[in-house]
A protein has these predicted regions:
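A cross-family glycoside hydrolase active-site/sugar-binding cleft signature
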Residues: 9, 113-115, 182
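Short, solvent-exposed loop/turn and secondary-structure capping segments
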Residues: 18-21, 77-80, 122-126, 173, ...
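Short secondary-structure boundary/capping segments
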Residues: 24, 126-129, 177
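Binuclear metal-dependent phosphoesterase catalytic core
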Residues: 50-55, 59, 147-149, 154, ...
Length: 195
């Protein structure tokens, strides 16, 4: 056992099984070295959490890692196919960022992780100033819930990391924030990129 702490974020395929994501998170919570928690308190989604990374001395937060449940599919076809990060999650992010800044007496830099990309990813892909593969259109929600704007306003998120589109593994920038894809994993997933 390598004793490496880990965290998970949920995406659209996690709701396709007969097991609710709340049960999946409860199972994961019992695993050694899991650090995923659940924001609770009316924040929509499962596994939204902020993970502080302490500095070398252990007396202050050096970075915050924000994990968001990007949900799955919308129930209203007039709003597109994919669901979106909800207002309660955006409000939670702002509150947690402000709380961390007050506690640490500075704006703590952060990274954000979620499965389904926000609409700004497609804008970055079309700018052609990316590094990596841009082999498919970004499949993001039709509705823009303002998460990226909140990142810009808070001025703490330095990069976002998503999955979802298996033929993309690019990195681009918008408003000083890196928008990054992780490369697909697993042997049963679609796509042309090498595993």
């Amino acid at each position: 056992l390598r004793k490496i702490p880990f965290a998970v974020t949920f995406g659209n395929h996690d709701t396709e099984a007969d097991v609710p994501t709340t049960d999946v998170l409860a199972f994961i919570a019992k695993r050694p070295y899991n650090v995923t928690t659940n924001a609770g308190g009316g924040v929509e989604g499962v596994g939204n959490c902020v993970l502080p990374v302490r500095n070398e001395k252990g007396d202050a937060t050096a970075w915050n890692l924000f994990l968001f449940d990007s949900h799955a599919y919308t129930n209203d076809s007039t709003l597109g196919y994919y669901d979106w990060i909800k207002k309660s999650q955006v409000d939670w992010f702002v509150a947690e960022s402000n709380r961390s800044a007050a506690k640490n007496k500075r704006n703590v830099p952060a990274l954000a992780f979620f499965h389904i990309p926000v609409p700004e990813y497609e804008y970055v892909r079309l700018q052609k100033n990316t590094v990596g593969n841009t082999s498919e259109k970004v499949c993001s929600p039709l509705l823009n819930s303002g998460l990226f704007f909140a990142f810009m306003q808070q001025q703490n998120v330095k990069a976002t990391f998503v999955g979802h589109d298996h033929n993309n593994d690019f990195v681009g920038s918008l408003a000083g924030i890196k928008l990054c894809y992780g490369r697909k994993t697993g042997f049963l997933s679609y796509g042309i990129l090498e595993k």
